[in-house]
């Protein structure tokens, strides 16, 4: 290894910076270009501020589209349509007629 001038900062040492500039390309070669490219492109880690995406506003005619949709029927109860009371009575009758012991 060549001797390095001790007065230079570590990030200014020869060979510490790649010869080509960083690009916005995400190909394999560019992802492994330097340590910064690897963390941002390869790993997807960025410590910068995240930009807020603005939500797309609905057009003014959106309420007319809501009216044209068919109404959904009321949700029906699942399971036994007779209800829980009758099913309990059936279980009680079965236990009375078929005693185990």
Curated annotation (Swiss-Prot):
> Which source organism does the UniProt entry give?
Human immunodeficiency virus type 1 group M subtype B (isolate SC) (HIV-1)
Sites of N6-acetyllysine modification: 28, 50-51
What protein name does the entry list? Answer: Protein Tat
Cross-link Glycyl lysine isopeptide (Lys-Gly) (interchain with G-Cter in ubiquitin): where in chain: 71
User: What processing steps or modifications follow its translation?
Assistant: Asymmetrical arginine methylation by host PRMT6 seems to diminish the transactivation capacity of Tat and affects the interaction with host CCNT1. Acetylation by EP300, CREBBP, GCN5L2/GCN5 and PCAF regulates the transactivation activity of Tat. EP300-mediated acetylation of Lys-50 promotes dissociation of Tat from the TAR RNA through the competitive binding to PCAF's bromodomain. In addition, the non-acetylated Tat's N-terminus can also interact with PCAF. PCAF-mediated acetylation of Lys-28 enhances Tat's binding to CCNT1. Lys-50 is deacetylated by SIRT1.
Q: Where is this region: Transactivation?
A: 1-48
Which positions does the motif Cell attachment site occupy?
Answer: 78-80
Q: Name one GO cellular component term.
A: host cell cytoplasm
The extra comment attached to this record reads: The SC isolate was taken from an ARC patient in 1984 in Southern California. HIV-1 lineages are divided in three main groups, M (for Major), O (for Outlier), and N (for New, or Non-M, Non-O). The vast majority of strains found worldwide belong to the group M. Group O seems to be endemic to and largely confined to Cameroon and neighboring countries in West Central Africa, where these viruses represent a small minority of HIV-1 strains. The group N is represented by a limited number of isolates from Cameroonian persons. The group M is further subdivided in 9 clades or subtypes (A to D, F to H, J and K).
Q: Where is the composition biased (Polar residues)?
A: 60-75
Provide the family line: Belongs to the lentiviruses Tat family.
Region ranges (Core): 38-48
For this chain, one GO molecular function annotation is:
trans-activation response element binding
Where is region (Interaction with human CREBBP) located?
Answer: 1-24
- Give binding positions for Zn(2+) 1: 22, 33-34, 37
């Amino acid at each position: 290894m060549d001797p390095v001038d001790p007065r230079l900062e570590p990030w200014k040492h020869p060979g510490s910076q790649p010869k080509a500039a960083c690009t916005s390309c995400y190909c394999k070669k560019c992802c492994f270009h330097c340590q910064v490219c690897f963390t941002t492109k390869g790993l997807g880690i960025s410590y910068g501020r995240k930009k807020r995406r603005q939500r797309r506003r609905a057009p003014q005619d959106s309420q007319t589209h809501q009216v044209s949709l068919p109404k959904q029927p009321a949700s029906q109860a699942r399971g036994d349509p007779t209800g829980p009371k009758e099913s309990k009575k059936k279980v009680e009758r079965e236990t009375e007629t078929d005693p185990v012991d």
